[in-house]
């Protein structure tokens, strides 16, 4: 790997800079900026790579302070040429997600804002609310993130009432539909009483609601209702009439109504402080507000660049019908023309992006900005509360600095069976779920009927910090994974077991570790026989309680999952020739042991890796009377 001592920044080596710039072609593509440690620190796109990259190093060129700082660190420039600007736009977005360059605008994964997911990858798609966007299945569609989770749940509830949708993730009975089918609330998906093709048509109607196409859907249904009435099919006409009435109630419940027009438009604005930018995007269709989306980003870039980044990511997976004809922006975008051209190509109609200066459209942007400002104030209040809690905790524990990263550990089991541990992480007082970890306890002394929380905690801590003990050169200064504080759920005994293993690893001096006992919320320190004198209502103690409760919740949920998986596997373990890998394939295909029991040998043989002979053996196991 190159080091800064070996390679000077390009701005300090004009001859090499000019040679490198001359190699870059005047074509569309993506460029990478690397620093002296060979890290990618910035990724950008342009319709003309050469002129865009050259602009970063031009004297007198209007650059933000952050971009000017970035340019002084660049030691190498790389590029990828693309055929079109659209390809460059998509490639840039994917590479930024992959490399997370320091000087790019990075959107934060704020799980406060929920999405609606439609699992188009499944024969019978599910529709549900989630706070985590999974990127593995390209066919699945996410709408959001929405600002009002209560309104979102109400829309989904009404949608399920209007259209007959599956009501349960798993069937209630193995051989018949539940009461929802008899009431007309579900088409009997669990027993496949409706074909996947017909069910997907129903789901597509619900998707139109979340695409902001409610009025278009009402028009389609109105036409279908008239045709049904003309054909004297009054039962169908009445059902469609009820669906239209339900959809109109959804429209009536929207919180803002704008002057009616036929133009679809999105309006985006932000409010920012020194750390965060809160962005709101309002979706207006047929003159009504049909969606309020929210995003959070770091605020180190220019406002226009932040808005551009949000719009690029938002529209990256949007279908053509979801792209509006107009996009109103609070600040001018650095590459508005490129984005507009790309969206125009995808929509098949002209898309314009501009900053309104007066009248109704300017007032709309002001309204979006006010909502973004309210959200920023909410975030600031939450940040102040957490800052106060970390300050109080630092004072209680006499820490030299505020604890930025705190890790909490807990053990869960039932009399030693399926023993697991949790590691949860709070960053600046807030849960950082992307850093959560769970462990299966491997200690042979922890068995059914014989639990040992002390040994289990010692094992987990040893596994967590093993690499630091084995490699003394591994720097802990500036390491984002290194905790400022470790909290163990338990009392003096649990703490002593962790202290002992850290001493063996020569890490005790580098780590601050405490325990929090459930009785009276007592805090214990290493080597102290008595707990600290604290008030359970102190902000710092409340922060530890939130951490402890989250560690307990995460450990218990993983323990339940392990027990459930074991119960599923235990029956399959009894079938000769059916190893763990094939068991996983069977469960992935049929979803449950009950479904495997109901399957025919031919259906079982459809599972990859399950031949006719093994399929017959599986069938015979569940149907011994047929053998």
From Swiss-Prot:
InterPro entries, per database record: DisA/LigA_HHH (IPR041663), GIY-YIG_endonuc (IPR000305), GIY-YIG_endonuc_sf (IPR035901), GIY-YIG_UvrC_Cho (IPR047296), Hlx-hairpin-Hlx_DNA-bd_motif (IPR003583), RuvA_2-like (IPR010994), UVR_dom (IPR001943), UVR_dom_sf (IPR036876)
Compartment list: Cytoplasm
Signal sequence range: none
Keyword set, alphabetical order: Cytoplasm, DNA damage, DNA excision, DNA repair, Excision nuclease, SOS response
Pfam families in UniProt: GIY-YIG, HHH_2, UVR, UvrC_RNaseH, UvrC_RNaseH_dom
GO molecular function: DNA binding; excinuclease ABC activity
Family designation: Belongs to the UvrC family.
Annotated GO biological process: nucleotide-excision repair; SOS response
Protein name, per record: UvrABC system protein C
Underlying gene: uvrC
Function: The UvrABC repair system catalyzes the recognition and processing of DNA lesions. UvrC both incises the 5' and 3' sides of the lesion. The N-terminal half is responsible for the 3' incision and the C-terminal half is responsible for the 5' incision.
Assembly with partners or alone: Interacts with UvrB in an incision complex.
Keyword flag Ubl conjugation: no
Domain UVR per the UniProt entry, residue ranges: 215-250
PANTHER family from the UniProt entry: UVRABC SYSTEM PROTEIN C, UVRC/OXIDOREDUCTASE
GO CC term (a single one): cytoplasm
GIY-YIG domain ranges (all copies): 26-105
């Amino acid at each position: 790997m190159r080091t800064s001592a070996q390679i000077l920044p390009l701005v300090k080596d004009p001859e090499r800079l000019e040679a490198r710039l001359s190699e870059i072609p005047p074509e569309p593509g993506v460029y990478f900026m690397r620093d002296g440690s060979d890290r990618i620190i910035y990724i950008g796109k342009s319709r003309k790579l050469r002129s865009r990259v050259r602009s970063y190093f031009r004297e007198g060129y209007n650059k933000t302070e952050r971009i000017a700082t970035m340019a002084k660190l660049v030691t190498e420039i790389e590029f990828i040429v693309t055929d079109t600007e659209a390809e460059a736009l998509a490639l840039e977005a994917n590479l930024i997600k992959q490399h997370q360059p320091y000087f790019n605008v990075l959107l934060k994964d704020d799980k406060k804002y929920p999405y609606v997911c439609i699992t188009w990858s499944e024969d019978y798609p599910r529709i549900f609310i989630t706070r985590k966007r999974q990127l593995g299945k390209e066919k699945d569609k996410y709408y959001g993130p929405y600002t009002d989770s209560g309104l979102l749940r109400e829309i989904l509830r009404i949608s399920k009432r209007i259209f007959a949708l599956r009501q349960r993730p798993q069937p209630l009975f193995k051989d018949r539909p539940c009461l929802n089918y008899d009431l007309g609330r579900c088409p009997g998906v669990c027993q496949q009483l409706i074909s996947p093709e017909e069910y997907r048509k129903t789901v597509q109607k619900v998707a139109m609601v979340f695409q902001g196409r409610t009025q278009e859907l009402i028009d389609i249904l109105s036409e279908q209702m008239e045709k049904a009435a003309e054909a004297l099919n009054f039962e169908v006409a009445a059902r469609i009439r009820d669906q239209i009435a339900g959809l109109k109630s959804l429209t009536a419940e929207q919180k803002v109504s704008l002057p009616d027009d036929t133009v679809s438009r999105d309006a985006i604005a932000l409010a920012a402080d020194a750390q965060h930018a809160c962005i709101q995007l309002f979706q207006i269709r047929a003159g009504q507000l049909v969606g309020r989306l929210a995003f959070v980003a770091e605020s180190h870039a220019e406002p226009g660049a932040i808005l551009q980044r949000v719009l690029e990511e938002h529209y990256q997976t949007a279908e053509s019908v979801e792209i509006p004809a107009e996009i109103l922006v609070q600040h001018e975008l650095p590459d508005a023309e490129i984005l507009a051209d790309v969206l125009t190509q995808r929509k098949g109609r002209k898309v314009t992006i501009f900053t309104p200066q007066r009248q109704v459209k300017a007032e709309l942007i002001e309204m979006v900005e006010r909502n973004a400002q309210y959200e920023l104030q909410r975030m600031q209040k939450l940040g102040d509360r957490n800052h106060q809690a970390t300050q109080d905790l630092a004072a209680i524990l006499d820490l030299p600095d505020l604890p930025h990263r705190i890790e909490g550990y807990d053990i869960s089991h039932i009399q030693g069976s399926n023993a697991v541990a949790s590691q949860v992480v709070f960053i600046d007082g807030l849960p950082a779920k992307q850093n959560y970890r769970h462990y299966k306890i491997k200690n042979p002394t922890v068995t059914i009927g014989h639990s040992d929380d002390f040994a289990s905690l010692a094992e987990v801590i040893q596994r967590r910090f093993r690499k630091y003990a084995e490699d003394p050169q591994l720097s802990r200064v500036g390491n984002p994974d290194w905790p400022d504080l470790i909290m163990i759920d338990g009392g003096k005994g649990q703490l002593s077991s962790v202290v002992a293993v850290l001493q063996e690893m020569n890490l005790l001096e580098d780590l601050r570790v405490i325990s929090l006992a459930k009785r009276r919320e007592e805090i214990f320190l290493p080597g102290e026989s008595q707990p600290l004198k604290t008030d359970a209502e102190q902000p710092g103690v409340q922060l530890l309680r939130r951490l402890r409760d989250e560690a307990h919740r995460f450990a218990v949920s993983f323990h339940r999952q392990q027990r459930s998986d074991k119960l599923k596997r235990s029956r399959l373990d009894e079938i000769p020739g059916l190893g763990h890998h094939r068991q996983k394939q069977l469960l992935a295909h049929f979803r449950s042991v009950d479904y495997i029991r109901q399957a025919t040998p031919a259906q079982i043989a459809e599972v990859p890796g399950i031949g006719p002979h093994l399929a017959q053996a599986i069938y015979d196991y569940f149907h011994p009377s047929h053998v």
